[in-house]
């Protein structure tokens, strides 16, 4: 993983996030809160473990993992998922599986920004973060 991912990132733009949350099955009240949130993402590494902490007024979440090893994750919308993060062509690709469903989250560095694509049932959400 490139050390360029490491650091603190602030959301600057978001497209189709409400549609993505609908595809995940998130209820209206939580979607409204999610749409208002402007999260900060902190990515750090200690040894073989990568930690991604997401902080917002809505909720804070944190995952720690080794690349290529499945782990249990409780998502911001309280889904209990089995997740795995791999390095794919310079991007961090995360796959969450729960209740027979699956979503993919791809984090890519582009022009000094972190572009996060979230894909579920044909819905593609793009969220762009700038380093703080």
Curated annotation (Swiss-Prot):
GO terms for molecular function: cholesterol binding; fatty acid binding. InterPro entries: Calycin, Fatty_acid-bd, ILBP, Lipocln_cytosolic_FA-bd_dom, Myelin_P2. The modification N-acetylserine is found at residue 2. Its main location: cytoplasm. Hexadecanoate binds at residues 107, 127-129. GO terms for biological process: membrane organization. CDD domains: FABP8 (cd19469). Pfam families: Lipocalin. GO terms for cellular component: cytoplasm; myelin sheath. It comes from the Eukaryota. It is found in: Cytoplasm. The keyword Acetylation applies. PANTHER family: FATTY ACID BINDING PROTEIN (PTHR11955). Forms a beta-barrel structure that accommodates hydrophobic ligands in its interior. May play a role in lipid transport protein in Schwann cells. May bind cholesterol. Belongs to the calycin superfamily. Fatty-acid binding protein (FABP) family. P2 protein and myelin basic protein together constitute a major fraction of peripheral nervous system myelin protein. This is Myelin P2 protein. It comes from Mus musculus. The lineage of its organism: Eukaryota, Metazoa, Chordata, Craniata, Vertebrata.
